[in-house]
């Protein structure tokens, strides 16, 4: 069974080399469908501790799981959902494709695609926890090196690979500092780095600004500032 998704991102998905000019949403989706053979990989990237994993869980719960008629397939997909929690501690440790098997989504107007989301650690931010152990940076194993490497280096490498090698569309998730224990300014350097990487590659992307008060005037003003700064549309959301 396929899942119908209204074109929520319609005019918001733009290519960096278009200078922020909006495209008709069906033209965007049809073009991506043609270029990718109907397989769309959404790279959910950005700073750590912004709600990337929470967004993926909500996306799956609302758009993917209800469309899985096979109860065993549905339970397997549910078991694959990423962990998420409040606070400063980083929960994600490596890139992960979700669901394991691509889910069919109907975008309307005869456009059908198969979608997978890619979760990743994200670029490090000041104040985050979980990468230091016994006053030293954790050393972790990765699929890319035989030896262990520092957690921060692994997180950066994995995030860049999601952006460069795996994603068809980028979804930059950042935060306004209204929830959790990190301030808005902590996220800015990693946020800028993520946007620069996507623009350099010319990949279509949009920005989600996670907030505990997405409809407030303050949050909407920040979204407008980021739209001007990055020349893409920014959507305030509460995941």
Residue ranges and their predicted role:
Residues 3-22:
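Short, Lys/Arg-enriched N-terminal segments with co-localized hydrophobic residues
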Residues 24-139:
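Conserved G1/Walker A P-loop phosphate-binding module
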Residues 113, 166-169, 201-204, 230-233:
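Short glycine-/polar-rich loops that comprise or flank the Walker A/P-loop
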Residues 121-124, 176-179, 212-215:
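Conserved nucleotide-binding/hydrolysis micro-motifs of P-loop NTPases
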Residues 129-179:
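Inter-motif core of Ras-like GTPase G domains
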Residues 157-158, 179-202:
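Amphipathic helical hotspot of TIR/SEFIR-family domains
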Residues 172, 207-209:
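Structural beta-sheet core signal
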Residues 204, 211-239:
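Canonical P-loop GTPase G-domain recognition
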